[in-house]
UniProtKB/Swiss-Prot annotation:
Role this protein plays: Catalyzes the reaction of cyanate with bicarbonate to produce ammonia and carbon dioxide.
Catalytic activity: cyanate + hydrogencarbonate + 3 H(+) = NH4(+) + 2 CO2
Listed name of the protein: Cyanate hydratase
Keywords: Lyase
Cited Gene3D superfamilies: Cyanate lyase, C-terminal domain, lambda repressor-like DNA-binding domains
Family: Belongs to the cyanase family.
Domain of life of the native organism: Bacteria
Gene that produces this protein: cynS
Pfam families: Cyanate_lyase, CYNS_N
CDD domains xrefs: Cyanase_C
A GO MF label: cyanate hydratase activity
Keyword Glycoprotein recorded: no
InterPro entries found in the cross-reference section: Cyanase, Cyanate_lyase_C, Cyanate_lyase_C_sf, CYNS_N, Lambda_DNA-bd_dom_sf
EC number: 4.2.1.104
Length: 156
């Protein structure tokens, strides 16, 4: 039976347990994800408390991290989403995404509306990918793909 959480602390506690096991076992998110049949981004978000995992994927993850049956069930619950507390983020990496939206948010909105019409890009019917590529000027670049379904506003 599908269960849902009405507050975030159970998943936050589980996330702490998961992260400690990941560190203790010296595992990457990629290694934990192997065998789940799901994307790396989705499983990582689930391990950080933002998505439920299907039972099979929860069991694969639990085996790698030595999690118990209660943790397996909790990994399958629908969480209270939103991992960033109110206000401006202070973590430098998260802040840069905030900064990108501050600078390019109105541009993205204008271009989405111009190309698609009045509506939104779904974060539910959504895929996320990140790749590291060489920078021709030296160093490396991050290529981040946000792939969401367009949902038009429907008058009623």
């Amino acid at each position: 039976m599908t269960q849902s959480l009405h507050y975030s602390s159970p998943r936050e506690t589980l996330t702490d347990t998961i992260m400690m096991a990941k560190i203790r076992k010296n595992l990457t998110f990629e290694a934990i994800n192997q065998g789940t049949g799901l994307s790396l981004a989705f499983v990582t978000a689930a391990l950080l408390g933002q998505h439920p995992l299907p039972e099979q994927a929860a069991r694969v993850v639990a085996e790698k991290l030595d999690l118990d049956e209660d943790a397996i069930r909790l990994l399958q619950t629908i969480p209270l989403r939103g991992s960033i507390p109110g206000g401006v983020p202070t973590d430098p990496t998260i802040y840069r995404f905030y900064e990108m939206v501050q600078i390019y948010g109105s541009t993205l909105k204008a271009l989405v509306h111009e190309q698609f019409g009045d509506g939104i890009i779904s974060a539910i019917n959504f895929k996320l990918d990140i790749k590291k590529v060489p920078d021709p000027d030296g160093g490396e670049r991050a290529v981040i793909t946000l792939d969401g379904k367009y949902l038009p506003t429907k008058p009623f």
